[in-house]
Amino acid sequence: MGGRKRNVRKMALAVIGIAGIVLACYFLLVNFLVSAALVPSFMKRLQAFERITNEGYAAQVQTEDIQENGRAALEGTKEWLKTVQRQKVSIQSEDGFTLVAELFPRTDNHRWVILLHGYTGWKEELYPFAYWYHEEGYQVLAPDLRCQGESEGDFIGMGWTDHYDCLLWIQYILSLDEEAEIVLHGQSMGAATALMVTGEEALPSNVKAVISDCAYTDAYSMFGEKIKEWFGLPSFPFVDSACLALRLRGGYNLKDASALEAVTKSRTPTLFIHGEQDAMISVGMSRELYEAAAWQKELLIVENAGHAQSQDKDPDTYYGTIRVFLDKTLAKQE
């Protein structure tokens, strides 16, 4: 009898030990997923940036007109950068990180634009937009989002921590120009960031409009898609577990990073733009955001454009639509 009890006890301890090992391996895997997607230093060791670059290229439409227009925009931007006045500026985030931006000032009016880049991007990617806005008479602020480019950070914010940082950049502009009329123009994750900003009750009335180019509806859905695509793992239970790990390690929850929820509360006029053939963020997401938006809104779908390519596929329509939308919106609020 005593021997049987000892055997049962040994079996129970063995089961507990195996369960503990499985659980530990599971949480190691979950933490690996978080680091592989959101920690640039870890991503670099995994050569994840090369994978993301290749994925981004695959999500684009490679046609001669897009490539030609893109090259022309870059050449024009290079010439502009040789002579334009600019300066590097920085602020501190609420959690103590130094955030860096490039400022392109003007002195002839109070119109401003904040340019917000995408996932694993940097401010220089949006300099062609800075060139266009500056020529249109806007003062331009182009930040590196946290943990990217020259800005410090521990985790990529997927728009959530970034939108709090953007609120600080807005306050920075207001410290320079109390009468500033501010436009937020974001691409991809930067667009989702801009939309999340407008969902804040404390948003200063100086923020007059948003240009949302190829935004996703929410980071939770995007993370689930990428886990499946990159690692062949199902969303459940890994995404929820990753949310818990990120909350413990990074201080935020992916479920909070919802542009879709923000637009239902927004009182900021918004122009939604998306490439019809975007293979990275479905055009359906911008349509969903547009339908959910509760305030003045417009939607531009650019045919035969891939991810973040609308401006190169049809620059006249892209920038012309933005110009008309902003002139109308800003004039209405003056």
Language model segments and positions:
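Conserved alpha/beta-hydrolase
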Residues: 132-152
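Short alpha-helix in the alpha/beta-hydrolase fold that links the catalytic acid
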Residues: 259, 268, 282-291
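Short beta-strand/loop motif that positions the catalytic acidic residue
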Residues: 265-267, 272-274, 278
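Hydrolase active-site cap/lid region
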Residues: 196-253, 301
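Catalytic histidine-centered segment of alpha/beta-hydrolase-like enzymes
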Residues: 305-319
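The serine-hydrolase catalytic nucleophile loop
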Residues: 119-132, 145
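An N-terminal hydrophobic leader/cap segment in hydrolases
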Residues: 24-92
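Alpha/beta-hydrolase active-site loop
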Residues: 125, 156-177
